[in-house]
Amino acid sequence: ETKWDNKSKMIPDTDINKNPNVGIGKDSDESYVFIYVKNAIVKDGEDALAKTPYFTLNANWSPVVDDAVGAKTNGNNNQYVSGLFMYTAGVPGVSAVLAPADDKAAYTGELFSTVHIPAVMNNTDVVDNPAMTVSCYIFGADQKGGETGAAANALAQAKKWAEKQA
């Protein structure tokens, strides 16, 4: 995260720079990449989702659909608050392989570029130690396992991993 400042102030109706990006080294195997975002900023309660900071995905990423660990919105399209996301290289809904080329590392591009602090959030809504934790899961692209293909296996394994992050 090249723009993240851990001392950023959460001011209602503003954006905070936060730009998670995943890379693999030039000698790495081709891989599927997943990111889980855990948003532990706002207390549970009435209208908690409307008060929860959210982000909008960039083009190389898609939400994972899953009742337990899937991407969650605040009720508005493309305003994500948490969950599992997959690298798609710009093809919505289709897992893509991240592969180093020309003896150089490869990067996914930012999952999102900013986090928006809703205008309705105030200091009484925030937990004592607010945090938005972004974790990455990288899975070798040649591992089919018991699934129909490597992409399906990567997704199944990422969902199991995400359960431990939630």
Language model feature labels by segment:
Residues 25, 38-42, 60, 137-139:
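Short glycine-rich beta-strand segments
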Residues 1-17:
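Beta-sheet-dominated interaction scaffolds and their linkers
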Residues 9, 26, 33, 70-71:
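Cationic, hydrophobic amphipathic alpha-helical membrane-interacting segments
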